Amino acid sequence: MEDFVRQCFNPMIVELAEKAMKEYGEDPKIETNKFAAICTHLEVCFMYSDFHFIDERGESIIVESGDPNALLKHRFEIIEGRDRIMAWTVVNSICNTTGVEKPKFLPDLYDYKENRFIEIGVTRREVHIYYLEKANKIKSEKTHIHIFSFTGEEMATKADYTLDEESRARIKTRLFTIRQEMASRSLWDSFRQSERGEETIEEKFEITGTMRKLADQSLPPNFPSLENFRAYVDGFEPNGCIEGKLSQMSKEVNAKIEPFLRTTPRPLRLPDGPLCHQRSKFLLMDALKLSIEDPSHEGEGIPLYDAIKCMKTFFGWKEPNIVKPHEKGINPNYLMAWKQVLAELQDIENEEKIPRTKNMKRTSQLKWALGENMAPEKVDFDDCKDVGDLKQYDSDEPEPRSLASWVQNEFNKACELTDSSWIELDEIGEDVAPIEHIASMRRNYFTAEVSHCRATEYIMKGVYINTALLNASCAAMDDFQLIPMISKCRTKEGRRKTNLYGFIIKGRSHLRNDTDVVNFVSMEFSLTDPRLEPHKWEKYCVLEIGDMLLRTAIGQVSRPMFLYVRTNGTSKIKMKWGMEMRRCLLQSLQQIESMIEAESSVKEKDMTKEFFENKSETWPIGESPRGVEEGSIGKVCRTLLAKSVFNSLYASPQLEGFSAESRKLLLIVQALRDNLEPGTFDLGGLYEAIEECLINDPWVLLNASWFNSFLTHALK
C-alpha cells in the first residue's frame, strides 16, 4: 500500500501526509491505510479549491488557464495540510477579519464567497452515516459539511453543494480511479474495512415521526422499510455480482452481463460512399504565403497596408481562368469576384491616403457569393399559426462519405516543423500566483518543441482570421468588408515576417444570437493543383492566377499559382472559440505534464530535465496499421498539439458524439488489457452509438480508422 500511495499521489501531498502523521506520532510505513486515507483527503481538498477564483466584482469564476493580468483572488483558503499552529493562526485571522464564529475543530477550507468554513469528508462507507457522524462531532451549524464517497455519492449540508457539477465530477472521477487502482492491486478490501467512524459519536441517531414515514416512502423499489434498506447498504459489496445489483434497481431492467474477451470487439464500420472533402475554414497544408521580411513600411501593422505590401512582392500575376469549377456554383461569379478584389486593391493604391479598411462594391457576383437576399423571409409565428399544413421544410440526410488519404496527410503535415517560429516564449502566459521553477522550466521546454510546429502556425492563423472576422462583423454589419488573411512569425535568424494567405470578403452580419451565421467568401493562394485530388476540393472553385518562380536544387522552376475560392459561413460562438485557439497549446502542455508527473512519481524526483533532454528515448505517439508508432519527446508534443488543433479546426457534433461514445469502448478495452475482466451489456448499442457519428466528417473518419488500428494491436 505504501508503494501505491507514493506512485498514485503528487509528491507534495505525500510529504504533507507524512508530516501530519508524524505530528500525531503515527508511522506511514505501519499505518498504511491511514496514510492512503490522509493523502486522498488532502487531494480532495486541493481539487475542491483548484481553478476557483473571485474576480474584481466579487463574483465567483472558474479559470483553468489564467490571464496573467487578471486580478483574481482564490475563492477558497486551504487550512487542511498546514501544521496545527499555522492552521489555527489562519482560522483566527479569518474569524477576526470576517466576524465568522470560530469553529471548535480545525475545518478544511474557508469559502470567501459564501463566508463559511467547510469540512470535507471522504468515506469508504455510506455517505449518510458518515455525514451524521461529522455533524454530531462538529455540533456547529456555521461549518458547512460536504461528504464524498468512493462510489460517486455525495452529501452536503442542506443539499448545498457549493461547487459546480463539473468540479465535483472531477473529484468523484479521481476517487473512483483511486478505488479502481487499489482494487487492481488487491488493496481495496483492506482499505475499505479499515475505516473507523468519527470517535466522538455519543448517541445513535434515530429517525422518528413524519421524517420516518417520509424515509420509508422515498426508498428505491423493492425495499419494504428503512431498516431493510440500511441492512442492504451495509452489506453492499461493490465488487459483487452486477446482475444482482441490476435486478435490485428495477423490475424493468433486464441485462445479462457478457464477459468482454479479446475476441469480443469488432472493428468500427466506416461508411462507404464518395471520398470526403476538405471542410476547414481556411486552407491548411495547401496554403501559400506571400511574405515580407522586417516590415518597416508606412502603416505597418494595419492589415490592409500589410496585405498590399505583400501583394507587391509577387510579379507573376496573369489573367485568371477557372481550372476546377465548383459543381453547384455559378463559377464565373467567383472569377469576377477575384478580378474585383484586384481592381479595388489597385483603386486603393491610386488614392492619396490608403484607408484602414476596405468595403467592396456590392456587385451582383458578390451578392450571389455571399447569399444576399437568399434567406427565406421570416414571418412572425402569430401571423401563421392558423395555417393548417405548417411544417418545417424537409432537409436531406447527410450523404455518407468514405475516408480519403488526404486527411492523414493533413495531420502528418500539421505535426511537422516549419522554418519559422510562430509563438514567443510567453505566449502560454504566466500563472496568477508566482509560478514555481519547475512549471516555468516545463513551459519553456514545451514551447521550444512546438514553437516552429505547423500546427502552431494554424493556431495563430485561426486566431487572426477569427478575430478579424468577428471585429468586422460587429463594426461593419452591412458592408462587404475585405479582410486580409495575415499571420506573423520570426525567421530562423530572428527577423520579423508578415505573411498574406489570401483574402476574405464578409457578408451582412447582423448577429443577434450566438448561432446566427455570417457568410463569407474566402480566396486563398496555393501551389497545389486541385486536379490531383478533385474530391478534396468539392466545395471550391479553383482559379489559376499566376506563375511563381521557385528555387530548387536544379535551379529556378516556374509553377502555376492557384486561388482557392469558396463560399463559407461561421457564427459568433464559432469565432469566439476560434479566437481562443491558443488554448490548444495549454491542453497539450497539460497532457505532457501528466506524462512527466507519472515518470517523476515512479523515480521519486522531478524528471522534467531528463524527460526533454534524453534524446535517445522514444515514446508512443499513436497507432497505425503498422503498429504502435514511436518518436522523440518533441514529436509527442507536436502530435498532441496537432490533435488538439484539429479538434478545434474540425469541431462538429459528429466529433463530440464520437469522442464521448468511443471513449467508453476504449475504457473497456483498457480494462481488458489490465486483466480486470470487464463485463458488458448491450455492446451492440454502444457500437450503434459510436457508428451513428461516422457520417462524412474527415477528422472523425480518421479518428475512427485510428481507433480500429488501436483495437487490432491492443487485442493481439
From Swiss-Prot:
Binding site for Mn(2+) 2: 80, 108
Localization in the cell: Host cytoplasm; Host nucleus
Record's keyword terms, sorted: Cap snatching, Endonuclease, Eukaryotic host gene expression shutoff by virus, Eukaryotic host transcription shutoff by virus, Host cytoplasm, Host gene expression shutoff by virus, Host nucleus, Host-virus interaction, Hydrolase, Inhibition of host RNA polymerase II by virus, Manganese, Metal-binding, Nuclease, Phosphoprotein
GO biological process, one term: symbiont-mediated suppression of host mRNA transcription via inhibition of RNA polymerase II activity
The keyword Transcription regulation is annotated on this UniProt entry: no
Family stated for the protein in its record: Belongs to the influenza viruses PA family.
Description of how the protein assembles with itself and partners: Influenza RNA polymerase is composed of three subunits: PB1, PB2 and PA. Interacts (via C-terminus) with PB1 (via N-terminus).
Name this polypeptide is given: Polymerase acidic protein
Organism: Influenza A virus (strain swl A/California/04/2009 H1N1)
Species classification: Viruses, Riboviria, Orthornavirae, Negarnaviricota, Polyploviricotina
